[in-house]
Amino acid sequence: LHQHFVTNNDRRIISQDMNRKTIGYNHARTELSTSITAKWMPTERLGLSVTLREEMYGAQWTPLIPAFYADYLISKRGTIRAKASVSRNYRYPTLNDLYFQPGGNTDLVPESGFSYDGGISFAVGKEGVYSLHGEATWFDSYIDDWILWLPLGGNTNYWTPLNMKDVHAYGVELKAGYDRMLSKEWQLGLDGNFSWTPSVNRGEAFSKGDRSLGRQLPYVPVYSAAVTGRLAYKSWRLLYKWCYYSERFTMTSNAFTYTGNVPYYLMNDVTLEKLFSARWADFSVKAAVKNLFDEEYVSVLGRPMPGINFEI
């Protein structure tokens, strides 16, 4: 059982036009989540589980949200496992979705739908020497009333969330990791992931001239990848992270125009971390260089992201 109280009391002036001021919103709601899980192992290799979850947002309860999971050990050698799941999705709009100023939309309805996924994984290694693991997952989701923030256009310069009637999100995710003990004090690690995630509007057009049907959702990259390298010596950690994001369309029509798409970009980060241990606590100090090669890129059209920057 989980319960928390969500509130926003943002009273700052967001914009001012002549005699009109736009300020933040002041809304709150209680959110409650409860779930129950049953597990069963009919054989030594097969595991099954069912989860029933229900959530409350303010005074409204979601329908019962079930999920079914299956896990089968194909081979003990290599720890090869097959996994599959079927689950119902139900998501209420956030407070920002409803009330953000400017742009919030109080007419939004909750997202709902079903998701299916299946995959296979393996893990091999020698204790104290090395470990190698990998995973491939396929997923398929059908979501009604997908909440999507879009620019209004015209004389306005802000975004608003809308419900997209029917969205088909599917794809493949690949993950792999390798760890090696070079000595008692030195450790080397490498992790990588790749995603192919089309998200397509299969429902209704927003208007008579809307060309979004059968096209990728705006600002959702079809391809993304990341590689992280780690080198550890005693209590020191050095991390290098490389990320790739494919181009993203800025309009529901997926038009290939100067303003119709955001180019792909690469990102490189380096982090140095020192771990400390005391009687009363364990803590760490980090120093990071973000955007190491000072790439010029944007995640949202017309909003340049920071060049090389530093964090401590």
Residue positions per predicted region:
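Transmembrane beta-strands of outer-membrane beta-barrel pores
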Residues: 3-7, 32, 52-58, 86-92, ...
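C-terminal beta-signal and adjacent terminal beta-strands/loops
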Residues: 244-253, 263, 272-312
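Outer-membrane beta-barrel "beta-signal"
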Residues: 69, 117-119, 306-312
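Surface-exposed extracellular loop regions of Gram-negative outer-membrane beta-barrel proteins
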Residues: 1-9, 24-57, 63-69, 178, ...
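Short loop/turn motifs that connect adjacent beta-strands in outer-membrane beta-barrel proteins
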Residues: 44-45, 75-80, 125-132, 181-188, ...
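Transmembrane beta-strands of outer-membrane beta-barrel proteins
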Residues: 1, 48-50, 66, 80-84, ...
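Membrane-embedded beta-barrel scaffold of Gram-negative outer-membrane proteins
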Residues: 4-7, 73-75, 81-83, 110-170, ...
